[in-house]
């Protein structure tokens, strides 16, 4: 739980927090370019993985027994997310993530929301046929 920074050992959470302070500024700068898209997730990227399997937002009471959302996702997806097998669930993830998406007054994703479904929609255009073949193969 420590990280080397400028020759000093600091708590990892503190290091990550200090690195993340610039994210809102960088987000606003990137959004100025119409050819670029930024996809944020709250609380983390794993909410996108979660929506590959689940239609509804996580239940807060279940979350309280876990240290992190990543740990929660690992425990709720039997065997964890399999990057070889589970991409066939892309269309489910897009629908589930879109249906559960909401923003706050500043336009930032609220808890258990992700904008990654927008990227998923773009990827799906290119892999739709391959995913259909893989789904048929997996039965």
Predicted segments with their positions:
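C-terminal accessory helical subdomains adjacent to catalytic cores in phosphodiester-
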Residues: 2-139
